[in-house]
Amino acid sequence: MDETIKLSRSTVEKYLNCPRCCVLDKKHKIKPPSLPFTLNIAVDNLCKNEFDYYRDRQESHPLFIEHNIDAIPFKHKDIDTWRSNFKGIRFKSTEHNYDFGGAVDDVWQKKNGELIIVDVKSTSRNNFDWFETFNKYDYAKAYKRQLEMYQW
């Protein structure tokens, strides 16, 4: 197979949930129907605009201060590419013939230069317990895998 296989977090999740669906998508370009996520897209854009405001000023967001996150939104010429669907951050392996990537929601930088990859999730629950959610719902495990993939 000479063609480079493009992989993403959603490709991995698709394979884990339905290997056949993944092969149909990647090899034959047959995609399952999808639903629009207009609320998620709106929340995503609001968060990006909010972080961009503080990125331009190179200041910590008030929530960072409130929750003791010693970081500021990372200012980089490629931030819009990294946050763009179908571009995003990428890792290409010519040895294994794959191109892995995904769009991040944001990148923050600590004072020591360390970068924090951010993926914003929203919930309608007033009291959110990550550990309870992680142990109870598979989607939470997918979110954890997503961040682990971006760390890689």
Name the predicted role of every residue range.
Residues K6-R9, K14, K26-K31, K48, ...:
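Context-gated lysine
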